[in-house]
């Protein structure tokens, strides 16, 4: 089962990716992890990636596709894989197709921007333990304080409204066009496309995914 997850940051992909990996026994492939592993292994592709990154440049789509092909040929991908955060653009999706990488399901997590902002901006963190709260959905017993230690909770820089809105704009400009791309691919019979209502409770989203993936 070869799956691509699409959806804005904060749409709940990470939580459900974990569930899909455990339920279907497939690894999650993140391009960041893959690049780091390739550089560490010192493979030919890894050396190329290191040279580009050391020069402060972005790794080319061709190189990332070559790394994806190398990664999905490994034993743990025998039953499939889960791609999250790639492809990000239509040229990357085209390059994947040209490289012969077949995808069985493209799952879009649909959540309105305002709810995403609400979800992320309301997060509060106890830095020392990693405990995460939410002012609305999972508040601490005492406002602004960790339940266990009573220490102050903080907001991560990534969770500030300005940062979240900027990431959403980037997502809509770069990645959202992939939705139309993969819907057309599904119409042509090259993959299956499903939109998942990400506003539901975690268990309901999970049930919807099980229904789609079988």
Curated annotation (Swiss-Prot):
Biological process GO annotation list? AMP salvage; nucleoside diphosphate metabolic process; nucleoside monophosphate metabolic process
Keyword ATP-binding applies: yes
Which keywords describe this protein according to UniProt? Answer: ATP-binding, Cytoplasm, Kinase, Nucleotide biosynthesis, Nucleotide-binding, Transferase
Q: Where is this region: NMP?
A: 30-59
Q: Cellular component per GO?
A: cytoplasm; cytosol
Q: Which reaction does it catalyse?
A: AMP + ATP = 2 ADP
Amino acids binding ATP: 10-15, 123, 132-133, 200
Recorded metabolic or biological pathway in which this protein acts: Purine metabolism; AMP biosynthesis via salvage pathway; AMP from ADP: step 1/1
* Top-rank EC class of the record's enzyme: transferase
Which superkingdom? Bacteria
This entry's Gene Ontology molecular function terms read:
adenylate kinase activity; ATP binding; nucleoside diphosphate kinase activity
Residues the entry annotates as binding AMP: 31, 36, 57-59, 85-88, 92, 156, 167
Location relative to the cell: Cytoplasm
Q: Where is this region: LID?
A: 122-159
Q: What is its EC number?
A: 2.7.4.3
Q: NCBIfam families, per this entry?
A: adk, PRK00279.1-1, PRK00279.1-2, PRK00279.1-3, PRK14527.1
Subunit architecture? Monomer.
Give the protein's biological function.
Catalyzes the reversible transfer of the terminal phosphate group between ATP and AMP. Plays an important role in cellular energy homeostasis and in adenine nucleotide metabolism.
Q: What is known of its domains?
A: Consists of three domains, a large central CORE domain and two small peripheral domains, NMPbind and LID, which undergo movements during catalysis. The LID domain closes over the site of phosphoryl transfer upon ATP binding. Assembling and dissambling the active center during each catalytic cycle provides an effective means to prevent ATP hydrolysis.
**Family assignment?**
Belongs to the adenylate kinase family.
Protein name as catalogued: Adenylate kinase
The protein's organism comes out as Salmonella typhimurium (strain LT2 / SGSC1412 / ATCC 700720)
């Amino acid at each position: 089962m070869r799956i691509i997850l699409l959806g804005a940051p904060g749409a709940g992909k990470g939580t459900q990716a974990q569930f899909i990996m455990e339920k279907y026994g497939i690894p999650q492939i993140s391009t960041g992890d893959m690049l780091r592993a390739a550089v560490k292994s010192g493979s030919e592709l890894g050396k190329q990636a290191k040279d580009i990154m050391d020069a402060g440049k972005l790794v080319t789509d061709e190189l990332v596709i070559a790394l994806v092909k190398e990664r999905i040929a490994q034993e743990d991908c025998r039953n499939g894989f889960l791609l999250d955060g790639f492809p990000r653009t239509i040229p990357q999706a085209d390059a994947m197709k040209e490289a012969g990488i077949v995808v069985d399901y493209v799952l879009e997590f649909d959540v309105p921007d305002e709810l995403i902002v609400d979800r992320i901006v309301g997060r509060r963190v106890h830095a020392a333990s990693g405990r995460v709260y939410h002012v609305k959905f999972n508040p601490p017993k005492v406002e602004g304080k960790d339940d266990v230690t009573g220490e102050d909770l903080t907001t991560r820089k990534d969770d500030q409204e300005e940062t979240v809105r900027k990431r959403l704009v980037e997502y809509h400009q770069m990645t959202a066009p992939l939705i139309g791309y993969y819907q057309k691919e599904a119409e042509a019979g090259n993959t299956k496309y499903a939109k998942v209502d990400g506003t539901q409770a975690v268990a309901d989203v999970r049930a919807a995914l099980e229904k789609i993936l079988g």
